[in-house]
């Protein structure tokens, strides 16, 4: 009889978590996200020496694209007071660390939610990308949008990023600023507004472009209603002659004796 090898829980625990396929996929996803965040950082940072966190990068990206300032929703006093304090016990330090991590995740979640709403509202990206908008997909769509639509960005954002967008030089940006804004042609500009008198007196046209029927002025007359009272029945009865046929009302003939009997009954 062959020997059956029974597996125990110790066999599964022998493999560390950082070597499992799930941890490898999470690590790969984290590295791609960090690369995209660094690319966003090169767009929104004011100088190369400026050191900003991922939350600040996302705040500036959201303000650059949508114009919404999410950073004002969070107060910076909470973290500064907690870092200045000296905690005696390890539990207090751990509590402050968890609170700081919650605030950091809340900031990132709000930024990604705002960018996701912007993508869905503008119908950006492909249909397959919009079905499952993960953080990597959101950052890829937003970076591509910034590079190809630098003219549509909000003017209140950082002006230093314009030379960095899509590899454009400062000369092209200056030439674009010197260009005159294109005016929108409307229908009313194609057809000038002319009055009827100007069209009639136009020397170039032999016949008027617009013709209107000449309606004479009818003077208002006052008439007495009572003087024409006799004509009113004839006015209303005349049309009825053509509509209703002439009807003869037939009444039964009564004899003189019956009439006398009726009068006697009334007298009695």
Swiss-Prot record:
Summary of the knockout phenotype: Hermaphrodites produce fewer live progeny at 20 degrees Celsius than wild-type, and also laying more unfertilized oocytes throughout the egg-laying period. Abnormal gonad morphology. Delayed recovery from the developmentally arrested larval state known as dauer. Significantly longer lifespan. Decreased movement. RNAi-mediated knockdown causes an increase in daf-18 transcripts.
InterPro entries tied to this protein: bHLH_dom, HLH_DNA-bd_sf
Domain bHLH intervals: 92-149
Sequence segments annotated as region (Helix-loop-helix motif): 106-149
GO cellular component: nucleus
Biased amino acid composition, Polar residues: 1-23
Superkingdom, taxonomy of origin: Eukaryota
Region (Disordered) residue spans: 1-29
Pfam family, one: HLH
Compartments, as annotated in UniProt: Nucleus
Keyword line: DNA-binding, Nucleus, Transcription, Transcription regulation
Basic motif: annotated segments: 92-105
Coiled-coil ranges per UniProt: none
A GO biological-process term: negative regulation of transcription by RNA polymerase II
One Gene Ontology term of the molecular function aspect: RNA polymerase II cis-regulatory region sequence-specific DNA binding
Role according to the record: Probable transcription factor. Modulates lifespan and also recovery from the developmentally arrested larval state known as dauer, perhaps acting upstream of phosphatase PTEN/daf-18. Regulates expression of genes involved in cell division, cell-cycle regulation, and sexual reproduction, including daf-18.
Record's protein name: Helix-loop-helix protein 25
